[in-house]
């Protein structure tokens, strides 16, 4: 295959994955939204799907899915996006895309070592994105009170980390189980 064709095929895959992933992000975020005791903070399963798509299609697709999906979800549900958290979802997708070795995953490899690596990356990403970037953005852009947004950020980071650790890991493990491991087929 010619190098230009590979780039074009990858671009098409990223665009298609972004469209499907963003649509799933919106639909799951709309249908499954479990409130926490902290206002404007909920358990959201779309981050598990974001983890799967980011792992399969890479950091760029992950960023676009998180950013576009969150912007659309906020627009549909609340009338306007909350841009600092929209950026946070995009950054989560970006970081999640670096948490899994795509080649291994597509070859059916997602064992304990890969699970640990993925969960370390996703936990650190949740701490940085929801514990720092989104709250600081809220303070700078929206003049929100620091104690409020840091509380929301810490709670969101913890519930998202738990959601991704359980449901995201499960989705990745199930996906890997559907792949044929290299060298497992014998000629008869």
From Swiss-Prot:
Keyword Cell membrane (UniProt): yes
Signal peptide coordinates: none
Membrane topology recorded in Swiss-Prot or TrEMBL: Multi-pass membrane protein
Transmembrane segments: 14-34, 48-68, 80-100, 120-140, 152-172
Subcellular location: Cell membrane
GO cellular component assignments: plasma membrane
Annotated source species: Lactococcus lactis subsp. cremoris (strain SK11)
NCBIfam families tied to this protein: PRK13661.1 (NF010182)
Protein name: UPF0397 protein LACR_0367
Keywords: Cell membrane, Membrane, Transmembrane, Transmembrane helix
Major localization listed first in the record, in broad terms: membrane
């Amino acid at each position: 295959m010619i190098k230009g064709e590979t780039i074009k095929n990858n671009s098409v895959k990223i665009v298609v994955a972004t469209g499907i992933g963003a649509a799933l992000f919106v639909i799951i975020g709309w249908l499954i939204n479990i409130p926490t005791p902290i206002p404007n903070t909920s358990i959201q399963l779309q981050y598990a799907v974001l983890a799967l798509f980011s792992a399969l299609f890479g950091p760029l697709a992950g960023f676009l899915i998180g950013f576009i999906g969150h912007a659309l979800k906020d627009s549909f549900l609340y009338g306007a996006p909350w841009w600092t958290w929209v950026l946070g979802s995009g950054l989560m997708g970006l970081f999640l895309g670096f948490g899994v070795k795509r080649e291994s995953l597509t070859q059916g490899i997602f064992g304990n070592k890969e699970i640990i690596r993925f969960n370390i990356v996703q936990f650190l990403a949740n701490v940085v994105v929801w514990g720092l970037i989104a709250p600081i953005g809220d303070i700078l852009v929206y003049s929100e009170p620091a104690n409020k947004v840091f509380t929301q950020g810490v709670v969101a980071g913890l519930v998202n980390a738990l959601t991704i650790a359980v449901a995201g890991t499960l989705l990745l493990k199930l996906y890997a189980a559907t792949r044929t491991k290299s060298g497992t087929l014998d000629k008869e």
